[in-house]
């Protein structure tokens, strides 16, 4: 048989794709920190309470107690602190040197020898107390004469005011008194009328004293008689 068999198409199988891993949700930074904290939480040791005073106080006490003329070295200070306070001196040594440097700059400690934290140190002499002179009471400055004169003038000018008021009040009283006096004056003329009537009696009595003119009349005829005698010559 010459007829060929029909060709059967075979499906081409595709290679399976590699499975991509599923993405894990991104962790927030806050959660990550919490996770770290949860893992690092360990019981903390309580801070040891120091059984000694501050370094500065211990060093000052050492220098005052040793009180060496040439100053105390750092070694001498260390020995004193160990004997007195029973401290771990190697741990405190950096703090001791730091305090000494700062105290020298401030003038709280004198450095007799050496430089920096090496050498010998001592306390400065106590400062002498200077007695402050008591403040003298302030004297009041004398006032100038002009001011005193002005004040006196003011006082003198103020005093006459009540006197003027009194004087002004007196005329009012006089006027009140003068009114009844006028009434009395008006009443007096009535009393003088009888005196006026009595005056004619005195006038009538005056003619009684007229004998003097008679003498003068008697003397005149004698003179007349003498004149004719001259004619006879």
From Swiss-Prot:
It is found in: Nucleus; Chromosome. Signal peptide: none annotated. Residues 51-125 form the H15 domain. InterPro entries: H1/H5, Histone_H1/H5_H15, WH-like_DNA-bd_sf, WH_DNA-bd_sf. It comes from the Eukaryota. CDD domains: H15. Its main location: nucleus. GO terms for molecular function: DNA binding; structural constituent of chromatin. Residues 1-55, 115-233 are annotated as: Disordered. Residues 172-186, 199-213, 223-233 have a biased composition (Basic residues). GO terms for biological process: nucleosome assembly. The keyword Zinc does not apply. GO terms for cellular component: nucleosome; nucleus. Keywords: Chromosome, DNA-binding, Nucleus. Residues 128-137, 144-155 have a biased composition (Basic and acidic residues). Residues 17-29 have a biased composition (Low complexity). Histones H1 are necessary for the condensation of nucleosome chains into higher-order structures. Belongs to the histone H1/H5 family. This is Histone H1-I. The lineage of its organism: Eukaryota, Metazoa, Ecdysozoa, Arthropoda, Hexapoda.
């Amino acid at each position: 048989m010459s007829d060929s068999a029909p060709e059967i198409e075979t499906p081409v199988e595709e290679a399976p794709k590699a499975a991509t891993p599923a993405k894990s949700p991104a962790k927030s930074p806050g959660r990550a920190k919490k996770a770290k904290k949860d893992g690092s939480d360990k019981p903390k040791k309580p801070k040891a309470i120091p059984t000694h005073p501050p370094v500065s106080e211990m060093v000052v006490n050492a220098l005052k107690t040793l009180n060496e003329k040439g100053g105390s070295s750092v070694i001498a200070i260390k020995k004193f602190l160990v004997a007195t306070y029973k401290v771990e001196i190697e741990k405190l040594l950096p703090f001791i040197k730091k305090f000494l440097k700062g105290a020298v700059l401030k003038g709280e400690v004198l450095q007799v020898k050496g430089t920096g934290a090496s050498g010998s140190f001592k306390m400065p002499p106590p400062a002498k107390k200077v007695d402050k002179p008591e403040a003298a009471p302030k004297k009041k400055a004398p006032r100038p004469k002009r001011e005193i004169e002005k004040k006196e003038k003011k006082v003198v000018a103020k005093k006459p005011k009540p006197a003027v008021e009194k004087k002004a009040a007196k005329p009012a009283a006089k006027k009140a008194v003068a009114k009844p006096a006028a009434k009395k004056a008006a009443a007096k003329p009535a009393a003088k009328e009888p005196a006026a009537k009595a005056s004619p009696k005195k006038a009538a009595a005056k003619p009684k004293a007229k004998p003097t003119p008679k003498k003068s009349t008697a003397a005149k005829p004698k003179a007349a008689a003498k004149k004719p005698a001259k004619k006879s010559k």
